[in-house]
Swiss-Prot record:
Gene Ontology CC entries for this record: cytoplasm; nucleus; spindle; ubiquitin ligase complex
Protein's cellular compartments: Nucleus; Cytoplasm, Cytoskeleton, Spindle
Superkingdom of the source species: Eukaryota
InterPro entries: DCN-prot, DCN1-like_PONY, PONY_dom
Tissue spec: Weakly expressed in testis, skin and immune tissues (thymus, spleen and lymph nodes).
Protein name according to UniProt: DCN1-like protein 5
PANTHER family in the cross-refs: DCN1-LIKE PROTEIN 5, RP42 RELATED
Upregulation: Expression is decreased in a time-dependent manner after UVC exposure.
The protein's assembly and partners: Part of a complex that contains DCUN1D5, CUL1 and RBX1; this interaction is bridged by CUL1. Interacts (via the DCUN1 domain) with the unneddylated cullins: interacts with CUL1, CUL2, CUL3, CUL4A, CUL4B and CUL5; these interactions promote the cullin neddylation and the identity of the cullin dictates the affinity of the interaction. Interacts (via DCUN1 domain) with UBE2M (N-terminally acetylated form) and probably with UBE2F (N-terminally acetylated form).
Record's keyword terms, sorted: Cytoplasm, Cytoskeleton, Nucleus, Phosphoprotein
Residues annotated as domain DCUN1: 46-232
Length: 237
């Protein structure tokens, strides 16, 4: 989860590198190297008091974990801010804004996860990753990401933020992602609205990589109609 300092587009969730003239996205690994989490005894029950004290290790005077606290939190748990596991955690906490956890979000979410310390959260990493492999949970995470990443005074995602979040969520699994990314790079679109965002996931799940089953008369957004047309021209040229 990129740390936002001024509510602009997020830090690059997937770095983009030049390769043979074509831009390809590199997705961060799920977890950087870290010491193994300490095994937690079943007798060590969840403590709301301990969870609150843990929150204050990172919160500022406004009782919010902001950019600086978030960086320290990520360092302590051994996860890069851009790592997709941070997006899953934010979803579990029902966090409203990227790069920020309120006290209410922290206590409600960590109570749900039964985590009141770093080690317990690290022991939940496999569970958090597993949510990405569940079709229903992934859909919920994907939809959550739209409102989570957008500036709250805007109805749509700016296109750079959309590309970064799509890279994080679909870059590893959608065969057409790199092509779609190239399309967005050269397109006229400067924002992506919620309907377009939702339909990109549906498109990635239902349309074949060769576009052979794409229904031109279907209720797809114009953005995707234009993408298909653009790609077919490239394939025949």
């Amino acid at each position: 989860m990129p740390v936002k300092k001024k509510r602009k587009s997020p830090g690059v969730a997937a770095a983009v590198a030049e390769d043979g003239g074509l831009k390809k996205c590199k997705i961060s690994s799920y977890c950087r190297s870290q010491p193994p989490a300490r095994l937690i005894s079943g007798e060590e029950h969840f403590s709301s008091k301990k969870c609150l004290a843990w929150f204050y290790e990172y919160a500022g005077p406004d009782e919010v974990v902001g950019p600086e606290g978030m960086e320290k939190f990520c360092e302590d748990i051994g996860v890069e801010p851009e790592n997709i596991i941070m997006l899953v955690l934010a979803w579990k906490l029902e966090a409203e804004s990227m790069g920020f956890f309120t006290k209410e979000e922290w206590l409600k979410g960590m109570t749900s996860l039964q985590c009141d310390c770093t080690e317990k959260l690290q022991n939940k990493f496999d569970f958090l990753r597993s949510q990405l492999n569940d079709i229903s949970s992934f859909k919920n995470i994907y939809r959550y990401a739209f409102d989570f990443a957008r500036d709250k005074d805007q109805r749509s995602l700016d296109i750079d933020t959309a590309k970064s979040m799509l890279a994080l969520l679909l870059g590893r699994t959608w065969p057409l992602f790199s092509v779609f990314y190239q399309y967005l790079e050269q397109s006229k679109y400067r924002v992506m609205n919620k309907d377009q965002w939702y339909n990109v996931l549906e498109f990635s799940r239902t349309v074949h990589a060769d576009l052979s089953n794409y229904d031109e008369d279907g209720a797809w957004p114009v953005l995707l109609d234009e993408f298909v047309e653009w790609q077919k021209v490239r394939q025949t040229s």
